């Protein structure tokens, strides 16, 4: 989708999320102590239903078992795509998934609306039809020389409207206004008419 695909001009790029970082609907999400700039990313996740390797792009849709919503909680502290990117994406409760897995063959994987609210205010409003590289391209790219297993998930990337999108920065990367970033007590909802609503409250880390 728009934001992540700015990184994908030469083809799909990806990073791994640790399964131990997962959270689900209703879970409190811990504000990472390593940053003061916590962001949200509304995404759609496809759930793999078959063990595959080196799958062709045109053969990927039958591999999909179902769909769920995701919030790719992110740290925005002068992070670039590289080793530090992994650090910014993996922390306890840092991958929101839910509220359930929808199994429905009538769903078009390239026409799933997804949006996000913070404290009731709509911040993101997108659709998987905005993906520059479709699910088949991602599946073919990821499964080349790497086996995908049932239960694995691939996330779509996020539409425009994240906090990091919202405000201009100084040449040194300092934000002129950080008010769009999340704070403890904020309630964040990822929503889709096809997949439900994933709701989490941000809390201070223990």
Describe each PLM feature range.
Residues 6, 76-206:
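Catalytic-pocket segment enriched in acidic/His residues
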Residues 1-122, 203-205:
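Active-site microenvironments in enzyme catalytic cores
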